[in-house]
C-alpha cells in the first residue's frame, strides 16, 4: 500500500467532504426510519474533526485516528457519535505508534474498529445498521490482500462490498435502533448508517488511488 500519515489525514478530509456533500441525502434517508438528523449530526462532527487536524505528512497514525474518534464522541448526537467514535478509537488503538499502515495494518485497524462498533451497538449482519456495510468491507479487504491483490485493488473491493451491503439493507426489517420501532414499516428503506459507512470506505479507496496517481506522475 502503504497508508502514510498524510494519506490518512487526506482520507479523513475526503470523508468530511463526502458527508458535507451528502448531508441532505443522509438526513432524507434517516427521516424515513430514524430521527431525520444523521446527515446533520455527522456533518457537524466531521466539521469539528477538520478543526482538530494538524495536517502534515508525518506523525502517529494511531494518534490521528484517536483524535477523530474522541472528537466524534463529543460532538455527534444520537447513536452515530458513540458508534463512529468507537470505530475510530479502536482503529487508533490498533494503529498506535505507527507512522504508516501496510495493507495488513489497515485491515487489522478496520477490523478492530468494526468489532468495537459491534460490541457497542450489539448489532449483527442483517440487523439493518452500519454493520451491514462494514463487515463485508472488512471481509473483502482481508480476502483480497490474502489473495495477493494490490492495496488499491483491495480497497476497491472493500468499497464495493460496502456498497453492496448498503443496498442490501433496503429490504431488511430493522432489528436495532430507532428504526426497529417501526417493525415491518422499516423495510424498503436504505439504512443511513450503512450509507455513511459506504462513504467512509469509498473515500478510502479514492484517497489512495489519487495519491498513487500523483506519485506515478511525479516519477
Regions flagged by a language model, labelled:
Residues 1-219:
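N-terminal loops that bind phosphate or other acidic moieties
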Amino acid at each position: 500500500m502503504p497508508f502514510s500519515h498524510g494519506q490518512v489525514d487526506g482520507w479523513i478530509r475526503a470523508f468530511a467532504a463526502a458527508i458535507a456533500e451528502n448531508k441532505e441525502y443522509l438526513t432524507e434517508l434517516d427521516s424515513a426510519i430514524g430521527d431525520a438528523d444523521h446527515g446533520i449530526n455527522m456533518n457537524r462532527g466531521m466539521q469539528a474533526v477538520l478543526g482538530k487536524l494538524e495536517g502534515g505528512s508525518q506523525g502517529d497514525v494511531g494518534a490521528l485516528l484517536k483524535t477523530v474518534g474522541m472528537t466524534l464522541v463529543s460532538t455527534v448526537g444520537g447513536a452515530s457519535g458513540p458508534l463512529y467514535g468507537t470505530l475510530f478509537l479502536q482503529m487508533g488503538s490498533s494503529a498506535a505508534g505507527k507512522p504508516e499502515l501496510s495493507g495488513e495494518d489497515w485491515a487489522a485497524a478496520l477490523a478492530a474498529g468494526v468489532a468495537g462498533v459491534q460490541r457497542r451497538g450489539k448489532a449483527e449482519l442483517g440487523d439493518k445498521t452500519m454493520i451491514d456495510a462494514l463487515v463485508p468491507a472488512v471481509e473483502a479487504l482481508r480476502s483480497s490482500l490474502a489473495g495477493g491483490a494490490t492495496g488499491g485493488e483491495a480497497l476497491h473491493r472493500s468499497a464495493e462490498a460496502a456498497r453492496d451491503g448498503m443496498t442490501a439493507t433496503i429490504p431488511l426489517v430493522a432489528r436495532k435502533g430507532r428504526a426497529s420501532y417501526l417493525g415491518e414499516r422499516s423495510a424498503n428503506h436504505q439504512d443511513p448508517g450503512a450509507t455513511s459507512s459506504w462513504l467512509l470506505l469509498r473515500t478510502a479507496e479514492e484517497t489512495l488511488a489519487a495519491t498513487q496517481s500523483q506519485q506515478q506522475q511525479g516519477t
